[in-house]
């Protein structure tokens, strides 16, 4: 079963291919059916998100309903991406769950100050993601689950 055309995509931004694979597998094993668009670094995510003409063609460039964002990446780190998203009138409504490799309270506080909606410590476990998504009220509104 695949995501319906009306289900928002989930954008996964992480420079580590292994992490992207594990996160995607975790979400899939938990029953998430949304299409997941993977970005290899922060700059790639910004290029996609700020491609305004893309929103005129939502089939080719769908606006994410949720962004899962790593912090430590080359080119543009997660802080930069988060700040750009949350200061843009068009994008700031997209919920962002930050992915951190350590439960570092300073890092978490900085992410919240920049506008993060939640955070999950890697490796991402479906149960933790589900709990955070539910807390944000996203579980039924954004995520596509099996019927």
PLM ranges: what are they?
Residues 101-103:
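Short, conserved "switch-loop" micro-motifs in signal-transduction and mechanochemical regulators
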Residues 117:
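Short, glycine/charged-rich "phosphate-handling" switch motifs in NTP-dependent
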Residues 1-11, 16-37, 43-46, 50, ...:
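Non-catalytic signal-transmission and effector/linker regions of two-component phosphorelay proteins
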């Amino acid at each position: 079963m695949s995501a319906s055309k009306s289900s928002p995509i989930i954008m996964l931004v992480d420079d580590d291919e292994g992490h992207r694979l594990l996160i995607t597998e975790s979400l899939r094993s938990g029953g998430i059916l949304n299409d997941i668009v993977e970005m290899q670094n922060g700059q790639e995510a910004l290029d996609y998100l700020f491609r305004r003409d893309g929103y005129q063609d939502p089939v080719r460039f769908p606006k994410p309903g949720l962004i899962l964002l790593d912090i430590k990446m080359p080119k543009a780190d997660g802080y930069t991406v988060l700040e750009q998203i949350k200061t843009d009138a068009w994008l700031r409504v997209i919920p962002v769950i930050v992915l951190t490799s350590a439960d570092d309270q300073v890092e978490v506080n900085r992410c919240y100050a920049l506008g993060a909606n939640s955070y999950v410590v890697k490796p991402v476990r479906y149960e933790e993601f589900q709990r955070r998504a539910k807390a944000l009220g996203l579980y039924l509104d954004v995520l596509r689950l099996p019927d």
